[in-house]
């Protein structure tokens, strides 16, 4: 669920609040072309959720743990495990692309996100 995703982001050394309104894809919804590597993390995360179809990606909880600096998804339910993996990959992506974070994309207007990008 979104709370667990936020905890993953925080545990990887980032603040979840940095990603709520960032670029064209971080936060609710998304459109256009990702603006940088950080925004691309959100784009890939949205695509990952999109592959899950109508599954409730925002509010379904799953089992995971932090182990030796990594996130381990341990749910036996395949959909919950897939959901966890979507969140895990994004949290790691944020940590790995932190040096691309650009404050000019925080609070970025969706009206500037006009190009198209396919998953």
Curated annotation (Swiss-Prot):
EC primary class: hydrolase
Chief localisation class: secreted
Transmembrane parts of this sequence: none
Catalytically driven reaction(s): a 1,2-diacyl-sn-glycero-3-phosphocholine + H2O = a 1-acyl-sn-glycero-3-phosphocholine + a fatty acid + H(+)
GO cellular component, one term: extracellular region
UniProt entry tagged with the keyword Disulfide bond: yes
Cystine connections: none
Source organism, top-level taxon: Eukaryota
Annotated active site: 45, 87
Any one Gene Ontology molecular-function term assigned to this protein's record: phospholipid binding
CDD domains in the record: PLA2c
SUPFAM superfamilies to which the protein is assigned, alphabetical: Phospholipase A2, PLA2 (SSF48619)
Keywords: Calcium, Disulfide bond, Hydrolase, Lipid degradation, Lipid metabolism, Metal-binding, Secreted
Cofactor(s) this protein requires: Ca(2+)
Miscellaneous field: Two very similar relatively non-toxic phospholipases were isolated from the venom, CM-II (shown here) and CM-I. The amino acid composition of CM-I differed from that of CM-II in having 1 more Thr and Ala and one fewer Ser and Lys.
Similarity field: Belongs to the phospholipase A2 family. Group II subfamily. D49 sub-subfamily.
Protein name per its UniProtKB record: Acidic phospholipase A2 CM-II
Protein's organism: Bitis nasicornis
């Amino acid at each position: 669920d979104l709370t667990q995703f936020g905890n993953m982001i925080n545990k990887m050394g980032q603040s979840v609040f940095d990603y709520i309104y960032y670029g064209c894809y971080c936060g609710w919804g998304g459109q256009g072309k990702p603006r940088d590597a950080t925004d691309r993390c959100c784009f890939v995360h949205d695509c990952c959720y999109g592959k899950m179809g109508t599954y409730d990606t925002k509010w379904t909880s799953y089992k995971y743990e932090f182990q030796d600096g990594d996130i381990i998804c341990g749910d036996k339910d395949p959909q919950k495990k897939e959901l966890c993996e979507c969140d895990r990959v994004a949290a790691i992506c944020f940590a790995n692309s932190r040096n691309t974070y650009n404050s000019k994309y925080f609070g970025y207007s969706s009206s500037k996100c006009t190009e198209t990008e396919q998953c």
